[in-house]
């Protein structure tokens, strides 16, 4: 009979500790880390070039980190789609390009700095019924006008109860590339990874006006874990 690896000591234990301490990286970061390592390799005889390449590789690996998260199991909750800081709370109409009724919904806006993990997660489980990209400007994502003026990508998720929850990826001053990996008809579970925005951005989450908001301005959020609201 094969011997079971001893995870209490030895190399298996060390490998397990490394895996638990260092979060994995989203696949979108591989080209950036690879290019940085190539610079370090090509410039290995020049100290400054080698150091710059290694620093860039480390920074990109940190930016594209994809930490594991444990979503809540209780039904009827909306979780944060992104790590970051809540910068806006209130009612607003959903993006016009979605063609939804012009009725105000609750909106929670999360600002992501370059130090936050930029992987986005589904705020609720359900079916993707719309994905719309709209070109725009690249103003600071902290500004309220960014919801209207900046480039954005909207994903509408319909819950089994027929409610629409909207997650809007908004490009920022530095962020110039929105990545969305879901399509109409896809089924998502709460907390599933569905995209990212490169280098600083914002996420707006829209949900029904009668939902009970559970977060406050200035609060930090963890994607897939922090509960933004309870649905009525």
UniProtKB/Swiss-Prot annotation:
InterPro entries referenced in this protein's UniProt entry, alphabetically: PS_Dcarbxylase, PSD-A
Pathway in which this enzyme or protein is active: Phospholipid metabolism; phosphatidylethanolamine biosynthesis; phosphatidylethanolamine from CDP-diacylglycerol: step 2/2
Major location category of this protein: membrane
Catalyzed reactions per annotation: a 1,2-diacyl-sn-glycero-3-phospho-L-serine + H(+) = a 1,2-diacyl-sn-glycero-3-phosphoethanolamine + CO2
Residues recorded with modification Pyruvic acid (Ser): 201
Gene Ontology cellular component annotations, sorted alphabetically: plasma membrane
EC number: 4.1.1.65
Domain of life per record: Bacteria
Annotated site residues (Cleavage (non-hydrolytic)) in this chain: 200-201
Keyword RNA-binding: no
Subcellular location: Cell membrane
GO biological process, one term: phosphatidylethanolamine biosynthetic process
Topology of the protein relative to the lipid bilayer: Peripheral membrane protein
MF annotations from Gene Ontology: phosphatidylserine decarboxylase activity
NCBIfam families from the UniProt entry: PRK05305.1-3
Function according to Swiss-Prot or TrEMBL: Catalyzes the formation of phosphatidylethanolamine (PtdEtn) from phosphatidylserine (PtdSer).
Protein name as annotated: Phosphatidylserine decarboxylase proenzyme
Origin species: Mycolicibacterium smegmatis (strain ATCC 700084 / mc(2)155)
């Amino acid at each position: 009979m094969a011997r079971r690896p001893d995870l209490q000591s030895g190399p298996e234990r060390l490998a397990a500790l490394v895996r638990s301490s260092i979060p994995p990286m989203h696949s979108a970061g591989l080209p950036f880390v690879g290019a940085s390592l190539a610079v370090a390799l090509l410039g290995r005889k020049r100290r400054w070039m080698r150091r710059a390449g290694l620093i860039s590789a480390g920074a990109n690996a940190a930016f594209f980190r994809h930490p594991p998260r444990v979503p809540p199991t209780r039904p009827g909750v909306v979780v944060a789609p992104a790590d970051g800081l809540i910068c806006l709370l209130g009612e607003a109409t959903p993006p016009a390009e979605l063609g939804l009724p012009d009725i105000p919904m609750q909106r929670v806006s999360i600002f992501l700095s370059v130090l936050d993990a930029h992987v986005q997660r589904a705020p609720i489980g359900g079916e993707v019924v719309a994905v719309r990209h709209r070109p725009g400007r690249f103003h600071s994502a902290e500004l309220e006008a960014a919801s209207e003026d900046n480039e954005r990508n909207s994903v509408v998720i319909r819950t089994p109860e027929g409610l629409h929850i909207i997650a809007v990826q908004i490009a920022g001053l530095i962020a110039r590339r929105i990545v969305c990996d879901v399509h109409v008809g896809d089924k998502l579970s709460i907390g599933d990874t569905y995209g990212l925005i490169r280098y600083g951005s914002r996420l707006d989450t829209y949900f029904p006006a009668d939902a009970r908001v559970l977060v406050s301005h200035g609060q930090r959020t963890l994607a897939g874990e922090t509960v933004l609201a309870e649905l009525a």
